[in-house]
Amino acid sequence: MHHNDHSNGMPMSMVFDTSTEITLFFQGWTTTTAASYSLTLLFLFALAVFNRFLGVLKFQLDVKHTQPTEGRVPKLQQPRARRRHAIPKARLSPQPRYMQVAETDTEDEAPFSSAQFLESDAEHTRHEFPSDLIQEPQGPLGTRRWWNVYRRWSWRRDGTGSLLEGLRALVGYALMLAVMTFNVGVLCAVVGGIVVGELLLGRYAQPSLGWQDDACHH
């Protein structure tokens, strides 16, 4: 039996063309004029830039949540000029008198041994931190775990990351379907959006992760 490929509509083109009449995503989105075609290309360009923005946003959130929160360390400041001149100090000595070694101190003192302090520090570390967090090497290279948890699970943090990852996948697949129309203008709009997005937002992401880190997302 002979089956007509054109009975169910226009087949998808398998070669690149420069036509301004394309059907994008669904049947109602068909560009019939040059103005609608230009607006479609502008939308795809902005969508590619937005996809790069989502990748940078997720990276920034991951960096923010994985950085350890350290307490504020007070900065040491020099004393004021008036107080600086009031500190007693010998004329040829770079140190004030209260920092100099007293004359009654003997030079023939026993050498300082730090072994006992290192041992006590190690014991203190073992009691303070759980044993599963202290990785001691076993053998020349030591043992490594396959699954390492680097942060705690949180609805706010992990939920936001999951939504961003799902949105990136949705936008990435939409761009892929748009390029599969084999239209030269659509291809140039998507690639141009990727280039401009990397040019504007690439410095806010990790250098080793570009647009090619995940083919489905970009």
UniProtKB/Swiss-Prot annotation:
GO terms for cellular component: plasma membrane. Its main location: membrane. InterPro entries: Cop_transporter (IPR007274). Induction: Expressed in copper depleted conditions via the regulation of the macA transcription factor. It catalyses: Cu(2+)(in) = Cu(2+)(out). Disruption phenotype: Does not affect the xanthocillin production, nor of fumivalines and fumicicolins. Putative copper transporter; part of the crm gene cluster that mediates the biosynthesis of a yet unidentified copper-responsive metabolite. Probably involved in the transport of copper, even if it does not act as a major copper transporter. In contrast to crmA, is not involved in the biosynthesis of fumivalines or fumicicolins. It comes from the Eukaryota. It is a multi-pass membrane protein. It is found in: Membrane. Keywords: Copper, Copper transport, Ion transport, Membrane, Transmembrane, Transmembrane helix, Transport. Belongs to the copper transporter (Ctr) (TC 1.A.56) family. SLC31A subfamily. This is Putative copper transporter crmD. The chain crosses the membrane at residues 37-57, 176-196. GO terms for molecular function: copper ion transmembrane transporter activity. The lineage of its organism: Eukaryota, Fungi, Dikarya, Ascomycota, Pezizomycotina. The keyword Acyltransferase does not apply.
